[in-house]
């Protein structure tokens, strides 16, 4: 056992000792192997390989080839190289430009409207409907709103009840259901409304006429929930307890107090019916079989509001006057043509007031002006100085005091001791009507009693005694009360003007207000809608006794009704309620010194003027003329219409003119001038001073507005009551397709887009004569369907002053289109019932509206005739008038030259004759105050200011010069009809992303047209750069390239340009270059420029056209102004092969005569020349590039090498394609400096395609592809051929682009219309002999090719005839009949023919005055725009 163990240990020890020896042996073997391998490799390279090479080189080879083999090899190699170069290298342009253009994403029609479907559902919340209706008062602050609505009550009207609307009870609002409002038409009861008895069918609906007894009521309007039932004008009488007596011209406030229920009962017929004067003028009833709920604000709430918050009262009065002007007067004058109702206001105003100035005051000013006129030789109206050296101090008047008037007329030498020159005198002219002064002489002044300056005493008896017993014979004298004759005259004039305006010192609406405080603390109030009569108030002073108090009971409970109703079914009237008593809220009369201060302020604003005979002081259609008071003489009021002047009436001494113009800010409807045979002396209060004083003394607005209301006729107030003032936010829908046409709209401000669904409903005629939808054909639920741009068609737009929907109203049909507000807009809605009522009373209205509709339909028919050649076009861009009212200039990012751009655009708009104003934040704040955008209350004033500007100016430019988060930025976006999005063309970062202002534009979801204005430092566009801007901006509808310098500071702040490596390397090489080489290069450069100048002078007739600077007619801002103002000039060049070279001469002649071009379009060769002009906008490059192309196309060898087997065409098209590509390169149509389009014939879809985007060479080649000669160009699977097959002169498409004037150049072959008569059969041999027979009288019969060509151009011939008759077209046809289609080798000859023809034609047109007055062509424009930046006309070399 031990031996075994010891042996094992021995073996293990041996193994451990032998292991290191084995490891060393393996390592040595590896080293030896690697060494041996390296030796073998080195040996092979150093010994074996050289030996092999030497052996091979020492051998001899011999190859024998025949000549034919060598030639074949060379031909094969050459062919392979040619094919590789020809189809691999030389066609790279085709493969690069064949990539599909990124199509813009189709937008959802839901994006056009922000209106949610849930909002279309009628809300059952009374408060929501009430808040919607109370917006007619403008924005009301919290306390004011609470005071106005704290005593509001509701009344429910059942379906079988008729409501007698008494507007003196309060202001009512429909919060649930629909009310039908009727007006009494007693004057038509025996004629028009009974016409059906005579066999005439007037087609009244069942609900149009309501009979109560013998009285007939005609439907006036339907008031839906959320709309006021009361007239806004009626609120003027709710603020005061002194009710104005009813007059024949008064409307709306007819009380039921004089009418009993039995008299108004339907079963009361015959002679027992009440007199027509006692019957209510306005009644209402619920529509259909559903009840209606009214919310009523009692009149006491308005009186309390007037007492506590007089400033809020002035705001409501401002809203009333604003609506009166914007809605009622604009509609009545501009659309309905009832100008007499408006002009009668001022005539009646002067007829009611016959007072004149005292003779002792007027005589002095008359003598002074006549003496000044006789002594002065300078032309103009002498004006009296505003104030004399003596200051008038407004002091508190005592009962026994008077005025001490120093008469300047009495300080003459002829009256040295006249005692009457220093006596206290009255300013009233009617003193002698009540007083008798003995021993009156001619020279003595008229001594009168003062009635307008009576001080209110604390005692009523003292006040009465002062007003009655005040007499000049008992007055004392006071030196402190001394006046000069001038100050007394001014005060007397103010008093006379106040009398006209309805301002009286005794008016409680004036004297109960303290102008120094806008509000007072809230007094105690009675809560509860049942106590509308405020019977618990102890402070009621002198309540007015109501005539029907005995038959009325007080509203003691909530269940009693405010308005009286009559049950139609039971024919029993409800118990008459007692009319609430008028409340006079407590308060003392203000100090007379306040009113004296008011008159003194107005007196300071008066300007005395002498008007020469026949001189006009107010021009028709002018704004803010002010009020004129006639002191002496007379003024003629003249209305001009259709070039004829008509004298309406004469304003004599003591009258005023300019009343409505100054009062509500409307434009003057008449011209006012002095009589031809005599001069006039007037006192003038400028409009801006009047507005300033009215704002200061705001409590004067209420009596002025009440006086105006009393002057309006009943018909005017009826129209005002029924008209609706609609406010539509941007993106909201005004009317939907398929809705009943129950009225038409007149656009007051804003813009609407007309949209039509391509899958319309199917209307069927019903028995009643109305169109209804037949839903039985397709019962498909489309309520949740989203419509995309492919499902809708944009038909056009409606702008300021245009009317919408008359045709549907006249034909009693459904709406055919959908109207969407482009921006925040306002319309005046004329209900169908009101229109029918007015048509019965005034047939002239129907005649005028019929003419408007007929003119519109006639224009539409002419446009449809014009569009007939384009019935097959694939262009879906509608004709939309680009005469934008408001233009917003919005940058993409900050630090862009927005203000400089706006200044240049405004200057250009003025240069073309537009009345334009630019608005930025600073100018708006200057006019409206620093809180114009911060207070919600200022929104009314802001919108009113914008509306006034839209009425006064043709174009308003909103300059967005504020940060993104500014309120002014959002205001600019919301106010724009067209938004010009400014961008720096070199800003690559913004091009591929979205700017900060663009994000706000997207967020606001505006639907206004948005055009991208790319600003370039030079007239050069990098090929392909424009599409980068446009491909991701689906909200951009167009773009313009504008040359304008951007300051270096702005450039660095906008972007950090990347310096190309090549440019940097070139700069370094230039710095290190030899000075001698630099001088040599400069010398070569100078020679090159000199040669270019020579070439330009040769082309432009011996240097007549300057090469030194940009001509005025090529100014980019003038071009942009014409496009935005619908004054654009379009150039259309027709097709005709080589005859189109004459287009080059015509274009150069246009440049010579300074005729601007804004849009370019063409067909075939016209698309080529037009593309050159639109791309370069320069005649030098056009001439050189066109000549280069003509030389290439006319090359015999190029044509020969391009021939192919004529299966589709005789030529492959390669040489032709490359010739065009050599000219245009990779420039896209979007890169052209001018807006451009060309047409082609799509033989795949049988349509005419209009190309405005994409690679220019490809679509110009498509437009020039003659069938048989060249193969069609394929694009998106369609084959495109020459556009001349359908329209060889696309004038109609240019008209759709908005061009007002179109210069159309036709170079097509003459259509042979020789009569043919060869019988019913034709022999080919006879045709051949007929052509060879020189004595034959028969015309040559066309061959098969001629017939195919004529057949191909049938559509084009008809389109040409229509193009010649298009309005605004200047048709030119150079004498090029002697040249063939392929005579490109005669370039210079054909060019000269076109140039000489156009030059002579334009010269003759100018001399004879036939050339249209194109905006931007006049000498004045050249002078005004001559200060623009000047640079080289051409932008790159040929």
From Swiss-Prot:
The active site is at residues 1164, 1282. GO terms for molecular function: lysophospholipase activity. Its main location: endoplasmic reticulum. A motif (GXSXG) lies at residues 1162-1166. It is found in: Endoplasmic reticulum membrane. A nucleoside 3',5'-cyclic phosphate 1 binds at residues 590-720. Keywords: Endoplasmic reticulum, Hydrolase, Lipid degradation, Lipid metabolism, Membrane, Repeat, Transmembrane, Transmembrane helix. The keyword Hydrolase applies. Pfam families: cNMP_binding (PF00027), NTE_Ploop (PF24179), Patatin (PF01734). Its EC number is 3.1.1.5. A motif (GXGXXG) lies at residues 1135-1140. Belongs to the NTE family. This is Lysophospholipase NTE1.
């Amino acid at each position: 056992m031990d031996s075994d163990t010891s042996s094992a240990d021995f073996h293990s020890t041996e193994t451990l000792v032998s292991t290191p020896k084995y490891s060393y042996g393996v390592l040595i073997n590896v080293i030896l192997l690697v060494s041996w391998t390296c030796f073998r490799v080195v040996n092979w390279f150093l010994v074996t390989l050289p030996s092999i090479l030497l052996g091979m080189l020492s051998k001899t080879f011999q190859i024998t080839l025949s000549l034919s083999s060598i030639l074949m090899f060379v031909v094969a190699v050459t062919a392979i190289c040619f094919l590789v170069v020809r189809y691999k290298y030389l066609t790279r342009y085709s493969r690069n430009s064949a990539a599909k253009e990124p199509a813009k994403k189709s937008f959802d029609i839901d994006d056009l409207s922000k209106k949610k479907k849930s909002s279309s559902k009628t809300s059952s919340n009374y408060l929501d409907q009430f808040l919607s209706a109370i917006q007619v008062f403008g924005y009301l602050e919290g306390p004011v709103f609470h005071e106005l609505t704290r005593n509001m009550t509701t009344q429910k009207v059942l379906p079988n009840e008729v409501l007698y609307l008494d507007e003196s009870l309060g202001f009512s609002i429909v919060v649930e259901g629909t009310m039908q409002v009727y007006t009494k038409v007693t004057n038509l009861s025996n004629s028009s409304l009974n016409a059906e008895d005579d066999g005439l069918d007037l087609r009244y609906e069942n609900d149009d006429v309501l009979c109560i007894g013998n009285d007939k009521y005609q439907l006036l309007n339907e008031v839906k929930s959320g709309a006021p039932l009361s007239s806004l004008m009626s609120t003027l009488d709710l603020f005061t307890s002194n009710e104005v007596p009813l007059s024949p011209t008064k409307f709306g406030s007819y009380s039921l107090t004089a009418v009993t229920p039995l008299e108004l009962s339907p079963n009361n017929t015959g002679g027992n019916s009440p007199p027509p004067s006692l019957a209510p003028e306005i009644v209402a009833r619920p529509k259909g079989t559903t009840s209606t709920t009214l919310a009523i604000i009692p009149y006491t709430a308005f009186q309390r509001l007037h007492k506590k918050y007089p400033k809020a009262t002035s705001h409501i009065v401002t809203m009333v006057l604003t609506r009166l002007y914007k809605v009622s007067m604009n509609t009545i004058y501009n659309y309905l043509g009832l100008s007499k109702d408006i002009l009668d206001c001022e005539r009646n105003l002067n007829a009611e007031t016959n007072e004149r100035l005292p003779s002792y005051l007027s005589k002095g000013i008359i003598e002074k002006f006549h003496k000044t006129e006789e002594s002065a030789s300078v032309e103009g109206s002498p004006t009296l100085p505003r104030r004399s050296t003596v200051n008038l101090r407004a002091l508190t008047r005592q009962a026994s005091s008077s005025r001490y008037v120093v008469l300047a007329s009495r300080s003459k030498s002829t009256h040295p001791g006249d005692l009457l020159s220093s006596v206290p005198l009255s300013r009233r002219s009617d003193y002698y009507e009540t007083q008798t002064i003995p021993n009156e002489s001619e020279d003595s002044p008229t001594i009168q009693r003062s009635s307008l300056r009576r001080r209110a005493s604390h005692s009523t008896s003292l006040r009465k005694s002062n007003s009655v017993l005040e007499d000049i014979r008992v007055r004392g004298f006071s030196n402190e009360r001394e006046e000069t004759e001038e100050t007394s005259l001014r005060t007397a004039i103010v008093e006379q003007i106040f009398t006209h305006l309805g301002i009286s010192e005794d008016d409680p609406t004036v004297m109960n207000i303290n102008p120094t405080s806008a509000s007072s603390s809230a007094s105690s109030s009675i809560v509860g809608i049942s106590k509308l009569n405020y019977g618990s108030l102890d402070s009621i002073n002198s309540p007015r006794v109501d005539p029907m108090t005995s038959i009325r009971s007080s509203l003691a409970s909530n269940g009693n009704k405010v308005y009286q109703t009559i049950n139609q079914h039971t024919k029993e009237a409800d118990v008459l309620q007692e009319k609430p008593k008028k409340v006079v809220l407590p308060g003392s009369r203000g100090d007379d010194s306040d009113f004296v201060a008011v008159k003194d302020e107005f007196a300071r604003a008066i300007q005395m003027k002498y008007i020469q005979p026949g001189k006009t002081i107010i021009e028709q259609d002018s704004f803010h003329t002010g009020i004129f008071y006639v002191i002496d003489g007379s003024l003629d009021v003249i209305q001009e219409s259709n070039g004829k002047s008509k004298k309406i009436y004469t304003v004599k001494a003591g009258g005023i003119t300019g009343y409505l113009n100054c009062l509500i800010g409307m434009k003057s409807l008449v011209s006012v001038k002095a009589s031809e045979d005599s001069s006039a002396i007037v006192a003038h209060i400028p409009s801006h001073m009047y507005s300033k004083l009215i704002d200061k003394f705001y409590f004067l607005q209420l009596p002025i507005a009440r006086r105006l209301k009393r002057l309006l006729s009943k018909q005017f107030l009826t129209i005002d009551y029924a008209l609706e003032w609609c406010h539509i936010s941007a993106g909201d829908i005004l009317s939907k397709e398929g809705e009943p046409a129950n009225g038409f709209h007149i656009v007051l401000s804003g813009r609407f887009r007309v949209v039509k669904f391509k899958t319309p409903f199917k209307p069927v005629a019903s028995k009643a004569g109305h169109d209804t939808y037949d839903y039985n054909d397709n019962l498909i639920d489309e309520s949740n369907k989203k419509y995309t741009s492919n499902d809708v068609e944009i038909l056009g737009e409606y702008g300021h002053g245009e009317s919408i929907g008359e045709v549907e109203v006249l034909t009693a049909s459904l709406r055919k289109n959908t109207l969407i507000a482009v921006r925040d807009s306002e319309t005046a809605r004329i209900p169908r019932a009101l229109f029918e009522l007015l048509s019965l009373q005034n047939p002239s209205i129907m005649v005028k509206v019929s003419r408007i509709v007929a003119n519109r339909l006639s224009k539409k028919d002419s446009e449809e005739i014009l569009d007939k050649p384009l019935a097959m076009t694939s262009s879906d861009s509608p004709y939309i008038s680009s005469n934008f009212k408001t233009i917003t200039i919005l940058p993409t990012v900050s630090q862009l030259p927005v203000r400089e751009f706006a200044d240049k655009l405004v200057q250009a708009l003025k240069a073309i004759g537009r009345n334009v104003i630019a608005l930025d934040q600073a100018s708006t704040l200057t006019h409206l105050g620093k809180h114009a955008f911060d207070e919600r209350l200022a929104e009314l004033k802001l919108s009113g200011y914008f509306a006034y500007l839209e009425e006064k100016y043709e174009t308003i430019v909103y300059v967005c010069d504020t940060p993104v988060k500014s309120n002014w930025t959002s205001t600019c976006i919301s106010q724009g009809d067209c938004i010009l999005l400014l961008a720096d063309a070199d800003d690559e970062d913004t091009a591929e992303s979205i700017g900060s202002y663009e994000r706000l534009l997207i967020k606001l979801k505006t639907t206004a047209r948005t055009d991208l204005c790319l600003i370039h430092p030079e007239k050069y566009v990098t090929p392909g750069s424009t599409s980068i801007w446009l491909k991701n901006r689906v909200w951009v509808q167009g773009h313009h390239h504008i040359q304008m310098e951007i300051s270096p500071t702005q450039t660095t702040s906008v972007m950090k340009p990347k310096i190309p490596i090549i440019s940097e390397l070139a700069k370094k090489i230039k710095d290190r270059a030899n000075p001698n080489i630099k001088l040599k290069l400069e010398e070569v450069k100078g020679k090159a420029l000199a040669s270019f100048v020579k070439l330009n002078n040769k082309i432009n007739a011996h240097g007549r056209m300057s090469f030194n600077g940009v001509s005025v007619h090529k100014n980019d801002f003038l071009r942009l102004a014409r496009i935005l103002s619908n004054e654009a000039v379009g150039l259309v060049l027709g097709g005709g092969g080589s005859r189109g070279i004459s287009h080059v001469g015509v274009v150069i002649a246009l440049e010579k005569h300074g005729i601007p071009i804004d849009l370019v379009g063409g067909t075939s060769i016209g698309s080529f020349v037009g593309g050159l002009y639109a791309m370069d906008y320069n005649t030098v490059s056009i001439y050189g590039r066109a000549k280069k192309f003509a030389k290439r196309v006319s090359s015999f060898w190029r044509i020969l090498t391009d021939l192919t087997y004529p299966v589709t065409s005789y030529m492959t098209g390669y040489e032709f394609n490359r010739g065009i590509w050599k000219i245009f390169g990779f420039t896209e149509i979007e890169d052209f400096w001018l807006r451009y389009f060309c047409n082609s014939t799509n033989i795949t879809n049988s349509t005419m395609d209009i190309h405005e985007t994409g690679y220019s060479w490809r679509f110009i080649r498509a437009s020039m592809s003659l069938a048989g000669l060249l193969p069609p160009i394929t694009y998106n699977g369609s084959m495109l051929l020459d556009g001349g097959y359908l329209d060889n002169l696309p004038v109609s498409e240019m008209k759709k682009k908005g061009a007002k004037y179109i210069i159309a150049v036709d170079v097509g072959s003459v259509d042979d219309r020789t009569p043919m008569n060869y019988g019913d059969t034709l022999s080919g041999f006879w045709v051949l002999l007929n052509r060879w027979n020189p004595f034959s009288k028969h015309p040559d019969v066309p061959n098969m090719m001629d017939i195919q060509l004529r057949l191909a151009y049938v559509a084009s011939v008809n389109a040409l005839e229509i193009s010649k008759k298009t309005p605004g077209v200047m048709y030119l046809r150079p004498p090029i009949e002697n040249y063939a289609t392929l005579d490109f080798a005669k370039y210079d000859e054909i060019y000269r023919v076109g140039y000489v023809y156009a030059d002579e034609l334009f010269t003759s047109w100018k001399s004879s005055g036939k050339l249209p007055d194109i905006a931007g062509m006049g000498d004045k424009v050249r002078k005004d725009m001559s200060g623009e930046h000047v640079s080289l006309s051409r932008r790159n070399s040929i």
